C-alpha cells in the first residue's frame, strides 16, 4: 500500500486524519492562467489582500461544486432512502476561506474539526476546475464496500480496499446537507515534504459532519422513502428536498465575518499621524530575486544585473522548440528552462531553477536526456550551469555565514523559511548589521523583517550572498535597530528578497 501511495504522490495524494475527519486529494497537475485569473482582483492582485466582501470562490465554481455534489449524492449505489439535498452555506464558506489562507496541508482549525467535516484538495500545474477534486473524492467509491443493515450489529463495519475512502463517504453522508468551499493560491506550499511553487488549494467544509464511526454513510432503500419529517415528503431527483432550500445566501459587498469586520473597523477608523509613521518607520520591500521566464527565454536575453540567478519556469517546456546547446555546461544562448529539464532539475511541470555563470568554455557536447536533444558546438563561448532550488527552515538566529557564505564567482542559498516572532529574539544573538545590504554575521530572518521582506509572522525569503562591503549603515526599520560596522576584518555580505 505504501508503494502504491508513493506512485500516486505526483498524481493523486490522499491523507487520512483520525477523528473521522475526511481526508485530502492532491491531483498533480501547469498553465495556471485560466484558473488564476478568476482569483485575482481588478488590479491584478491575488486575493491574499482581498477587499472587504471579496469572496474566496467564484459564483460559477460555487454552483458547479454544489451541483456536482447533489448529482453524485443522487446516484449512489446501493440507492439511498434518506439522502438529503445539499445547499451552500456562507458561514462554512468563510471558515473554509480562513483555513485555505493558512496554506497548511492538514485539516483544521482544530477548534472546528469536532463540528464540521472537511475535504481538501490541491494541485499545481495545468488548469483543473474545483470539480475535478470533487469527482476524485467521489471516485474512491471503487474501493468502498457499503455496509448493509444485516452487517451492522450494532456497529457497521468500515471496509475500504484502497488508501482511503473517507473523502467519498463525506461527500455522500446523508445528513451532511450544507457545504461551503474556498480556493486560495498558495506560494511554495509544503505538500508532504515537496514544495509546490503555486498550489491551488481547495477547502470544502461540511455540516453536519459525516464519517461517524460505526455508521453507514446513508440508509439503503427506495429513494426518499426514509426522509426526515422536516422535509414534508419533498423529493427531488432521489434527494430529500424542502421547497426553497436551493436558495443560498450571498453576502453583500460590505459584509464579512465578525472577526474580519471588527478588524476592518479598527483599521478604517484609526487616523494615522506623522508621529505614528516616524515611530514605526515601516518599510515594505516586494523586490524579488527570482524572475518568471517563458520556455523560450535564453540566459543571454535575461541575465542582466545582479539578480539573475534564480528563475521560475512554466509547464510544457518539453513541447517548446527553443534550442539547448551543451550538456552539464550550457551555452548562454540556450533556453534556461529546457536546459533545466535536460539536466533533470525540473520536469515538464515547471518549477524553480538556480543558474550559475561559469565563464568561457572551449566546446559544448550534445546529448539526449529527459526528452530533450541538445546541440553540440565547438567554438568558445560563455557558459552556465543549472542547479535545484532547495527550501530550508531556519531559526531566528541563523546567519548567512553559517548557511551559505559567499564564494566567488557566486553562491546559491536555499530558499529559507523564517519562523514567527523573530522581532522578539535577543538582538545580541540575532544581530542585524547594515541596511539593505547586510553583513553575513546578521540574522537572516531579522534582517528580512528589518528590510520589509517579511513581517513578524514569518514566511519565505530568498537570500543572495555577495562580497563584503567596507561599511554597513545602521537604521531603525519595522521595529528593529540595525548596527553599523566599518572596515570589517572578515566575513561577507548578503541581500534579502521577497518571495511572492
Curated annotation (Swiss-Prot):
GO terms for biological process: face morphogenesis; hematopoietic stem cell homeostasis. Its main location: secreted. It holds the Pfam family LCCL. CDD domains: CAP_CRISPLD1. Residues 289-384, 390-492 form the LCCL domain. Disulfide bonds join 295-313, 317-337, 396-418, 422-445. Residues 1-23 form the signal peptide. The gene is Crispld1. Belongs to the CRISP family. It comes from the Eukaryota. GO terms for cellular component: extracellular region. It is found in: Secreted. This is Cysteine-rich secretory protein LCCL domain-containing 1. Residues 258-281 are annotated as: Disordered. Keywords: Disulfide bond, Repeat, Secreted, Signal. Residues 66-206 form the SCP domain. InterPro entries: Allrgn_V5/Tpx1_CS (IPR018244), CAP_dom (IPR014044), CAP_sf (IPR035940), CRISP-LCCL_domain (IPR051957), CRISP-related (IPR001283), LCCL (IPR004043), LCCL_sf (IPR036609).
Amino acid at each position: 500500500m505504501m508503494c502504491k501511495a508513493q506512485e500516486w504522490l505526483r498524481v493523486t495524494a490522499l491523507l487520512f486524519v483520525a477523528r473521522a475527519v475526511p481526508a485530502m486529494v492532491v491531483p498533480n497537475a501547469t498553465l495556471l492562467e485560466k484558473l488564476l485569473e478568476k482569483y485575482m482582483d481588478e488590479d491584478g492582485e491575488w486575493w491574499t489582500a482581498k477587499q472587504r466582501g471579496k469572496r474566496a470562490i467564484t459564483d460559477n465554481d460555487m454552483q458547479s461544486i454544489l451541483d456536482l455534489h447533489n448529482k453524485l449524492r443522487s446516484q449512489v449505489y446501493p440507492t439511498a432512502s434518506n439522502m438529503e439535498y445539499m445547499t451552500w452555506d456562507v458561514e462554512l464558506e468563510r471558515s473554509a476561506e480562513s483555513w485555505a489562507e493558512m496554506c497548511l496541508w492538514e485539516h483544521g482549525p482544530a477548534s472546528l474539526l469536532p463540528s464540521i467535516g472537511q475535504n481538501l484538495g490541491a494541485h499545481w500545474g495545468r488548469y483543473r476546475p474545483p470539480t475535478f477534486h470533487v469527482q476524485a473524492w467521489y471516485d474512491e467509491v471503487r474501493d468502498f464496500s457499503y455496509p448493509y443493515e444485516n452487517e451492522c450489529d450494532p456497529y457497521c463495519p468500515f471496509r475500504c480496499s484502497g488508501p482511503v475512502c473517507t473523502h467519498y463517504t463525506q461527500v455522500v453522508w446523508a445528513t451532511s446537507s450544507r457545504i461551503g468551499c474556498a480556493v486560495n493560491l498558495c506560494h511554495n506550499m509544503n505538500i508532504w515534504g515537496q514544495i509546490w511553487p503555486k498550489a491551488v488549494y481547495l477547502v470544502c467544509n461540511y455540516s453536519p459532519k459525516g464519517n461517524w464511526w460505526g455508521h453507514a454513510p446513508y440508509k439503503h432503500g427506495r429513494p426518499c422513502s426514509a426522509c426526515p419529517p422536516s422535509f414534508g415528503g419533498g423529493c427531488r431527483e432521489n434527494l430529500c428536498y424542502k421547497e426553497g432550500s436551493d436558495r443560498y445566501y450571498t453576502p453583500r459587498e460590505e459584509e464579512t465575518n465578525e472577526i474580519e469586520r471588527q478588524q476592518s473597523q479598527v483599521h478604517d477608523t484609526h487616523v494615522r499621524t506623522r508621529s505614528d509613521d516616524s515611530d514605526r518607520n515601516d518599510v515594505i520591500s516586494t523586490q524579488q530575486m527570482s524572475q518568471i521566464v517563458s520556455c523560450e527565454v535564453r540566459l543571454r536575453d535575461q541575465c542582466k544585473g545582479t539578480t539573475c540567478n534564480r528563475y521560475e519556469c512554466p509547464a510544457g517546456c518539453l513541447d517548446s522548440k527553443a534550442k539547448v546547446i551543451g550538456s552539464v555546461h550550457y551555452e548562454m544562448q540556450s533556453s534556461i528552462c529546457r536546459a533545466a529539464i535536460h539536466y533533470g532539475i525540473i520536469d515538464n511541470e515547471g518549477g524553480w531553477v538556480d543558474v550559475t555563470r561559469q565563464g568561457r568554455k572551449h566546446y559544448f557536447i550534445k546529448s539526449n536526456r529527459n526528452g530533450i536533444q541538445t546541440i553540440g558546438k565547438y567554438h568558445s563561448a560563455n557558459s552556465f550551469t543549472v542547479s535545484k532550488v532547495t527550501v530550508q527552515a531556519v531559526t531566528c538566529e541563523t546567519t548567512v555565514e553559517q548557511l551559505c557564505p559567499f564564494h566567488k564567482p557566486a553562491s546559491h542559498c536555499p530558499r529559507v523559511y523564517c519562523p514567527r516572532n523573530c522581532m522578539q529574539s535577543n538582538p545580541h544573538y540575532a544581530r542585524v548589521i547594515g541596511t539593505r545590504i547586510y553583513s553575513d554575521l546578521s540574522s537572516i530572518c531579522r534582517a528580512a523583517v528589518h528590510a520589509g521582506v517579511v513581517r513578524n509572522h514569518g514566511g519565505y525569503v530568498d537570500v543572495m550572498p555577495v562580497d563584503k562591503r567596507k561599511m554597513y549603515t545602521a537604521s531603525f526599520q519595522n521595529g528593529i535597530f540595525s548596527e553599523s560596522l566599518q572596515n570589517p576584518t572578515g566575513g561577507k555580505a548578503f541581500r534579502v528578497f521577497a518571495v511572492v
